Swiss-Prot record:
Stated name of the protein: Acetyl-coenzyme A carboxylase carboxyl transferase subunit beta, chloroplastic
Gene: accD
Ranges of residues in domain CoA carboxyltransferase N-terminal: 47-310
Gene3D superfamilies cross-referenced by the UniProt entry: 2-enoyl-CoA Hydratase, Chain A, domain 1
Stored PROSITE patterns: COA_CT_NTER (PS50980)
GO terms for cellular component: acetyl-CoA carboxylase complex; chloroplast stroma
Enzyme Commission (EC) number: 2.1.3.15
Sites where the protein binds Zn(2+): C51, C54, C70, C73
Gene Ontology BP, a term: malonyl-CoA biosynthetic process
Length: 310
């Protein structure tokens, strides 16, 4: 029986040696500009992806089956917001909220491209209206409110739409006494919106105060690569339970900014999830394929306790 090249690879999820060397050599020139940035896994862009940690060539079909985790080194590659929703929410139970909300360029901001152009390009690239998806759905049979940031939309930056959608999600969860899960992936506040983007930090923190303290409801924050800037400085670190993916980059300011400001060298891994966990800033580091089960157990434990608003 004649076997196609694709079928041959599908029978062998691990490939290396001469094949891996050949593939690396054949794609080296085209990958030069990609070496220093994370690879977004998208089947429409080809059959192969490259792990940003170990450099191994990965067959996209198997990579997606493995939740975008490198099977060679265990590195967690980036995921779209829709992929994360499909990972956590039971099939056919997802109900999006405020999905038609889109940003406006009220400051007429422009650098290389206008803000309006950047929004349109990101919308075309991702199919999203902005850098977060919010909604409700069942997680192993438990109804939760879920917000998922998408780094592929303008670096997951937080502007007025992101802040408003998350705020409305928290208010919705408060009214219906739902557990809240926010998946963070962001480069920080969106500079194109100026002060409007910065005020989202205070706005979200305020509604979380009502949700957590006054109503005693459960908020779980999940930090992924990368979670930085205004998201880290606000709702990212306000969870009752704070979870991170392995080796996630979590910071307020970048390493170079810190070193230039303090005029001293900071150690490697200083802003990795494992370092934050060792210093008591995180509660758990959970591999991606175990996250749904962990969230389900925490939510189930919380819901098993009789609700007492006082």
């Amino acid at each position: 029986m004649v076997m196609s090249v694709i079928n041959w690879f599908e029978d062998r999820q691990k490939f290396g040696g001469l094949i891996g060397a050949f593939l690396e050599e054949a794609t080296r020139s085209s990958m030069t500009n990609e070496r220093d940035r994370r690879i977004s896994v998208n089947a429409n862009k080809g059959l192969w992806a490259r792990c940003d940690n170990c450099g191994n060539m990965l067959y996209v079909k198997f990579l997606k089956q493995n939740r975008s985790v490198c099977e060679e080194c265990g590195y967690h590659l980036s995921m779209s917001s829709m992929e994360r929703i499909e990972l956590l929410i039971d099939p056919n139970t997802w109900i999006p909220l405020d999905e038609d909300m889109s940003a406006r360029d009220i400051l007429s901001f422009s650098d290389e491209d206008s803000y309006e152009t950047r929004i349109l390009l990101s919308q075309e690239k991702t199919g999203l209206t902005d850098a977060v998806q919010t909604g409700i759905g069942y997680l192993n049979g438990t109804l939760i409110a879920l917000g998922v940031m998408d780094f592929h939309f303008m670096g997951g930056s937080m502007g007025s739409v992101v802040g408003e959608k998350i705020t409305r999600l928290i208010e919705y969860a408060t009214q219906r006494l739902l557990p809240l899960v926010l998946i963070c992936a962001s480069g920080g506040a969106r500079m194109q919106e100026g002060t409007l983007s910065l005020m989202q930090m205070a706005k979200i923190s305020s509604v979380l105060q009502l949700y957590q303290v006054q109503n005693k409801l459960l908020y779980i924050s999940v930090l992924t690569y990368p979670t930085t800037g205004g998201v880290t400085a606000s709702f990212g670190m306000l969870g009752d339970i704070i979870i991170a993916e392995p080796k996630a980059y979590i910071a307020f300011a970048g390493k170079r900014v810190i070193e230039q400001t303090l005029r001293q060298k900071i150690p490697d891994g200083f802003q990795a999830a494992e370092s934050l966990f060792d210093n008591g800033l995180l509660d758990l580091i959970v591999p991606r394929n175990l996250l749904k089960g962990v969230l389900s157990e925490i939510s189930g434990l919380y819901l098993s306790v009789p609700y007492n608003k006082n």
